[in-house]
Swiss-Prot record:
InterPro entries: Com_YlbF, YheA/YmcA-like_dom_sf. Pfam families: Com_YlbF. This is UPF0342 protein LGAS_1451. Belongs to the UPF0342 family. HAMAP family: UPF0342 (MF_01526). It comes from Lactobacillus gasseri (strain ATCC 33323 / DSM 20243 / BCRC 14619 / CIP 102991 / JCM 1131 / KCTC 3163 / NCIMB 11718 / NCTC 13722 / AM63).
Amino acid sequence: MVNIYDNANQMAKDLQETEQFKDLKKSLENLKNKPESLDLYQRMDKLQQQILAAQNSGQPLSDDVKKEYQKINEEVRNNDELKDMITKEQALFQMINDVQQAMTKPIGDLYDDLKAK
């Protein structure tokens, strides 16, 4: 019998050897070494957490939060380190999405005979 958890753990190790993972890791190191970029990232992360908490609790976003969000987004668009990090993140998550689709295809295939034709 196959131990799927061993395979998952191996896949996690393999993920760290991919170009996409290494590129993101390098991009994050570059970001950490730029105090201005790191500060912007931390402000962006904190604001995203506030927005998520408000959404999860059904609270509307205040005008101040909306303005801060717009301001930070503009700063991010003008920050090379953050733009690079986001691009590298997207590439990594695209690869993970592709792998997830391949892994879950057999589940979808189980339902093929049930679908209306």
